[in-house]
């Protein structure tokens, strides 16, 4: 049976040190080879924490494959806004402001990993993460924007986004 190691690494900057080295060293794999593969597979997520699965297919032959997940929603929001972190005073001092277009872009990236039944619900999940990070949406409190979504204020925007999929 294949062994699986799951780690969170910075895109394009995995190193043989912790958490990778200690996790894959005991499996008998060439750590440098694994690190190089991970860096190649995650380079487009540079600066973001990315979930990675290392699947050891045959320990005797030392064969493995890498599966790269989608970064957490908070990482995608930070990347979209170009901010290093969320607000340390969420609710008082905004860390940034997302447009609905940016919310929908992030929701489209994450929808396959969410429990949301549609793009509207996925967008509301993204907005919930923005709220916890102290990020406003359309210059407003994220809770207000969630109510507006329920009221149909952004229906035209969602219809366009779903057509483009």
Swiss-Prot record:
This protein's GO CC annotations: large ribosomal subunit
Keyword rRNA-binding: yes
Residues forming coiled coils: none
PROSITE patterns xrefs: RIBOSOMAL_L11 (PS00359)
GO MF terms, alphabetically ordered: large ribosomal subunit rRNA binding; structural constituent of ribosome
Biological processes per GO annotation: translation
Keyword rRNA-binding: yes
Keywords: Ribonucleoprotein, Ribosomal protein, RNA-binding, rRNA-binding
Pfam families given in the database record: Ribosomal_L11, Ribosomal_L11_N
PANTHER family (UniProt xref): 60S RIBOSOMAL PROTEIN L12, LARGE RIBOSOMAL SUBUNIT PROTEIN UL11M
Subunit note: Part of the ribosomal stalk of the 50S ribosomal subunit. Interacts with L10 and the large rRNA to form the base of the stalk. L10 forms an elongated spine to which L12 dimers bind in a sequential fashion forming a multimeric L10(L12)X complex.
Function field: Forms part of the ribosomal stalk which helps the ribosome interact with GTP-bound translation factors.
Family according to the record: Belongs to the universal ribosomal protein uL11 family.
HAMAP family: Ribosomal_uL11
Protein name: Large ribosomal subunit protein uL11
Organism encoding this protein: Thermococcus kodakarensis (strain ATCC BAA-918 / JCM 12380 / KOD1)
């Amino acid at each position: 049976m294949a062994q699986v190691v799951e780690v969170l690494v910075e895109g394009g900057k995995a190193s043989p040190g912790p958490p990778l080295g200690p996790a894959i060293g005991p499996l008998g794999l060439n750590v440098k080879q694994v690190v190089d593969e991970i860096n190649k597979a995650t380079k487009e997520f540079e600066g973001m924490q990315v979930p990675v699965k290392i699947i050891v297919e045959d320990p005797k032959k030392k064969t493995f494959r890498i599966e790269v997940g989608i970064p957490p929603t908070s990482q995608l929001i930070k990347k979209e806004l170009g901010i290093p972190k969320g607000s340390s005073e969420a609710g008082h001092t905004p860390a940034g402001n997302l447009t609905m277009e940016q919310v929908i872009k992030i929701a489209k990236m994450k929808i396959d990993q969410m429990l949301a039944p549609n793009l509207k619900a996925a967008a509301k999940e993204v907005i919930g993460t923005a709220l916890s990070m102290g990020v406003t949406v359309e210059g407003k409190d994220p809770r207000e924007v969630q109510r507006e979504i329920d009221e149909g204020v952004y229906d035209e925007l969602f219809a366009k986004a779903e057509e483009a999929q």
